[in-house]
Amino acid sequence: MLRFSFSHAFAGSYGLAPARATRFYPRILPFAARAYSADKQGDDVILRVKVAPIKRNNETLEQQRARLVYQSRKRGILETDLLLSGFAAKYLKHMTAEELNEYDELLNELDWDIYYWATKNSDASPLPEKWQHSKILRKLQAYSENKDKQILKMPDLSEF
């Protein structure tokens, strides 16, 4: 049985009835309706969407650091914001070009995945093979243990 709850939720969030929503979002809703199916009424299905990162050519190391500071601070999930912004304030200015590229790749992952990997919660989100031997992720995991027992807060921009 095909479920349309995603499109109903999408339409409802914009205050539109589902029939009217397809008129305004004709390319999104039919795709969303076909994105998954369920065997029984009430089956929960998780839909994960990952957007391909923008290729940045000719970016200097300083430009990359500035972008990574922003991306570390403005994730959209408070837990990940606090973790990554503190990590970036502590380590970003000392990273090599190779480490910056690895950190950049890590930031292209989904927010909750980064959080669960950093906190070593493999039950919620298993760590992919790609990140098994990552130096940056190991550093982030060590940082997330908060051995100094400090209260995490968003660091000032002057700390970067």
UniProtKB/Swiss-Prot annotation:
Coiled-coil zones: none
One Pfam family in the UniProt entry: Sdh5
InterPro entries listed in its UniProt record: SDH, SDH_sf, SDHAF2
Keyword Chaperone appears in the UniProt entry: yes
Gene Ontology biological-process annotations: mitochondrial electron transport, succinate to ubiquinone; mitochondrial respiratory chain complex II assembly; protein-FAD linkage; tricarboxylic acid cycle
Any one of the GO CC terms: mitochondrion
Domain of life: Eukaryota
Keywords annotated in UniProt: Chaperone, Mitochondrion
Annotated localization: Mitochondrion matrix
Gene3D superfamilies referenced in this protein's UniProt entry, alphabetically: Flavinator of succinate dehydrogenase
Keyword Cell inner membrane annotated: no
Family: Belongs to the SDHAF2 family.
Note: This protein may be expected to contain an N-terminal transit peptide but none has been predicted.
Record's subunit section: Interacts with the flavoprotein subunit within the SDH catalytic dimer.
Functional description taken from the UniProt entry: Plays an essential role in the assembly of succinate dehydrogenase (SDH), an enzyme complex (also referred to as respiratory complex II) that is a component of both the tricarboxylic acid (TCA) cycle and the mitochondrial electron transport chain, and which couples the oxidation of succinate to fumarate with the reduction of ubiquinone (coenzyme Q) to ubiquinol. Required for flavinylation (covalent attachment of FAD) of the flavoprotein subunit of the SDH catalytic dimer.
HAMAP family: SDHAF2
Protein's recorded name: Succinate dehydrogenase assembly factor 2, mitochondrial
